[in-house]
Amino acid sequence: MSKSRKPSLLPPGPVMVDVAGGQLTEQEKQRLRHPLVGGVILFARNFENRAQLTALTQDIHAARGEPLLIAVDHEGGRVQRFREDGFTALPAMRTLGEVWDRDPLAAMQLATQTGYVLAAELRACGVDMSFTPVLDLDYGVSKVIGNRAFHADPRVVAMLARALVQGLALTGMAACGKHFPGHGYVEADSHHEIPVDTRTLADILKDDAAPYGWLGDQILPSVMPAHVIYPEVDSQPAGFSRRWVSEILRGQLGYDGVVFSDDLTMEGASVAGDILARAQAALSAGCDMVLVCNRPDLADDLLERLSFTPPAVDRIRRLMPAYAAPDWDSLQADSRYQHARRIQSQIISG
């Protein structure tokens, strides 16, 4: 690229957007250059094959002088956006919890190897982070969480999450714990409804929120709050609540990492008003970056109307991998990767 055409060195902004397909359109390139944009979240619709995905992430990173953060929901089980052309079929996190009940040491090993395979494959294709692990407790009632949760015991959840994050870290990938302070106790799906959890703050902190306090920002460089209302604590969903984000998560639990909002287009976010009101509420509560997914019209509306609020730039930058990852062919020949896949296969089949 010639010097005159080099993208401007904008710091990351507080809005994460998405793209429609497998290649960037000119309109999307323009959107990514907006100073309020700080990241891009990918979905299954953005994947045709590994070569195409790698080209797409290269184009996204090249859109700005300081590359945007590229993220994806790639947890394993039913929430795994890329499943073909060599990507490993990752187990649902409940599988790790079931292994724990038989053999805790084997479960810890499986969690680390799963995290490593997950992250190594994503990074080989240019994806910077996955919004994982899910720290919600498995109460057996939540429709949207289900087998995405490790276990019902918060101590087991914390141990398995820590092991999974260790695997991510082996590749240079940051983790994101979700959905603070806990989405597992309510049946409603916040994508389509507004869940309400009527428990007391003491009960939530003792169980659901405990892993966040135990792990902290050294293990979880980022956290995503739930679009769930806890009326005994605040009338607003956690992601829009200064009580939850600033006072409890950051103040009481001492958390100093990045806080992402969940998708502002979800039904659970509708209580805060229009897209601008939702973003303002999340940022005012203490979130560092807000997600606007599947509605480019709302993303553009927000980018046009949101007054610039300097984001926690240093926090956000810490989520970017510090070093380059091996490409796919090099990864396939890597002995650590081969070992991790063998461990996964042996433990799950056994």
Swiss-Prot record:
Gene3D superfamilies: Glycoside hydrolase, family 3, N-terminal domain (3.20.20.300). Disulfide bonds: none annotated. PROSITE patterns: GLYCOSYL_HYDROL_F3. Pfam families: Glyco_hydro_3 (PF00933). It is an enzyme of class 3 (hydrolase). It is found in: Cytoplasm. GO terms for molecular function: beta-N-acetylhexosaminidase activity. One of its GO terms (biological process) is regulation of cell shape. It catalyses: Hydrolysis of terminal non-reducing N-acetyl-D-hexosamine residues in N-acetyl-beta-D-hexosaminides. InterPro entries: Beta_hexosaminidase_bac, Glyco_hydro_3_AS, Glyco_hydro_3_N, Glyco_hydro_3_N_sf, Glycoside_hydrolase_SF, NagZ_Beta-hexosaminidase. Its EC number is 3.2.1.52. PANTHER family: BETA-HEXOSAMINIDASE, BETA-HEXOSAMINIDASE-RELATED. Belongs to the glycosyl hydrolase 3 family. NagZ subfamily. This is Beta-hexosaminidase. It comes from Bordetella avium (strain 197N). The lineage of its organism: Bacteria, Pseudomonadati, Pseudomonadota, Betaproteobacteria, Burkholderiales.
